[in-house]
């Protein structure tokens, strides 16, 4: 049996609101296999983004554990956690978070350079991915010179450039029109098939959610497979 790309066990996370502690995640369990696509749906404020941040090592759970390729986040220091995030995970958000002063090519190269890849190789990898997402003619354009759909495609290329085991996506089509949203969906599937990347997608878009292998619902801090 293959090793899970991401696994979490009994994850609990809460926040303080004045004198009260609000428990957002209550014993969440999840396991993602290589190449699997899952969607996480739920009402606004249900903790979907919090769960994504915990799975990506951006936030620490109050209890429970998260593993990425059998590495437990709790056993890693900050530098090693950063390496796992940079080399084994990719992140895409509703608001692309591209660096405005850099071109599309430079934005996609950035994770490679941070990982210590030589500039020439980073450039080659970034150009190849931007070509795959249909932006070979926009390499030297800065984010302000790109459309919303183009910026999101740059963000997806950036998330994939280090060939991560899993890409975590928070409302990736939330800011896009129907045509661009469908284009992003197709692109995700195509690139995943080529690279065997797993995807965890937090979304309100039920059309997007229903294209995934499995849909989970987060409600009252508890994560369940849709229909259970």
UniProtKB/Swiss-Prot annotation:
Part of the ABC transporter complex LolCDE involved in the translocation of mature outer membrane-directed lipoproteins, from the inner membrane to the periplasmic chaperone, LolA. Responsible for the formation of the LolA-lipoprotein complex in an ATP-dependent manner. Residues 6-228 form the ABC transporter domain. PANTHER family: ABC TRANSPORTER ATP-BINDING PROTEIN MG467-RELATED (PTHR42798:SF2), LIPOPROTEIN-RELEASING SYSTEM ATP-BINDING PROTEIN LOLD (PTHR42798). Pfam families: ABC_tran. Keywords: ATP-binding, Cell inner membrane, Cell membrane, Membrane, Nucleotide-binding, Translocase, Transport. Its EC number is 7.6.2.-. It comes from Saccharophagus degradans (strain 2-40 / ATCC 43961 / DSM 17024). Gene3D superfamilies: P-loop containing nucleotide triphosphate hydrolases (3.40.50.300). Transmembrane segments: none annotated. GO terms for molecular function: ATP binding; ATP hydrolysis activity. It is found in: Cell inner membrane. The keyword Translocase applies. It is a peripheral membrane protein. It comes from the Bacteria. The gene is lolD. ATP binds at residues 42-49. This is Lipoprotein-releasing system ATP-binding protein LolD. One of its GO terms (cellular component) is plasma membrane. GO terms for biological process: lipoprotein localization to membrane. NCBIfam families: LolD_lipo_ex. It is an enzyme of class 7 (translocase). The complex is composed of two ATP-binding proteins (LolD) and two transmembrane proteins (LolC and LolE). Belongs to the ABC transporter superfamily. Lipoprotein translocase (TC 3.A.1.125) family.
